[in-house]
Swiss-Prot record:
Residues 23-48, 90-116 are annotated as: Disordered. InterPro entries: REV_protein. The RNA-binding motif binds to the RRE, a 240 bp stem-and-loop structure present in incompletely spliced viral pre-mRNAs. This region also contains the NLS which mediates nuclear localization via KPNB1 binding and, when the N-terminal sequence is present, nucleolar targeting. These overlapping functions prevent Rev bound to RRE from undesirable return to the nucleus. When Rev binds the RRE, the NLS becomes masked while the NES remains accessible. The leucine-rich NES mediates binding to human XPO1. This is Protein Rev. It comes from Human immunodeficiency virus type 1 group M subtype B (isolate ARV2/SF2) (HIV-1). HIV-1 lineages are divided in three main groups, M (for Major), O (for Outlier), and N (for New, or Non-M, Non-O). The vast majority of strains found worldwide belong to the group M. Group O seems to be endemic to and largely confined to Cameroon and neighboring countries in West Central Africa, where these viruses represent a small minority of HIV-1 strains. The group N is represented by a limited number of isolates from Cameroonian persons. The group M is further subdivided in 9 clades or subtypes (A to D, F to H, J and K). Keywords: AIDS, Host cytoplasm, Host nucleus, Host-virus interaction, Methylation, mRNA transport, Phosphoprotein, RNA-binding, Transport. Asymmetrically arginine dimethylated at one site by host PRMT6. Methylation impairs the RNA-binding activity and export of viral RNA from the nucleus to the cytoplasm. GO terms for biological process: mRNA transport; viral process. The lineage of its organism: Viruses, Riboviria, Pararnavirae, Artverviricota, Revtraviricetes.
Length: 116
């Protein structure tokens, strides 16, 4: 399977190029025309996008043996997350600028999805 450790990435790159070509073959609709014409073009475009999405999923699962959907990430409970704004907050004069740190109580939170 391409993309796995020890395997060639050629098949993965070829598959990505094919999926990219599919999406490029369906550009967004033009904003010209009457409201009804624009609505119809958007509706047809969305339907083609849905078809491309399903074809892309089929290509990924058939040629690469993997799911089109990402593996869900197990996140810790929100009650255990805190924002630490002790660094770089208010120093620059612009509110909301900077990257607040997210502190997690303990790394053991990410180990299992069961509650204690």
């Amino acid at each position: 399977m391409a993309g796995r450790s020890g395997d060639s990435d050629e098949e993965l790159l070829r598959t990505v190029r094919l999926i990219k070509l599919l999406y490029q073959s369906n550009p967004p609709p033009s904003p010209e025309g009457t409201r009804q014409a624009r609505r119809n073009r958007r509706r047809r475009w969305r339907e083609r996008q849905r078809q491309i999405r399903s074809i892309s999923g089929w290509i990924l699962s058939t040629y690469l043996g993997r799911s089109a959907e990402p593996v869900p990430l197990q996140l810790p409970p929100l009650e255990r997350l805190t924002l630490d704004c002790s660094e770089d907050c208010g120093n620059s004069g612009a509110q909301g600028v900077g990257s607040p740190q997210i502190l997690v109580e303990s790394p053991a939170v990410l180990d299992s999805g069961t509650k204690e």
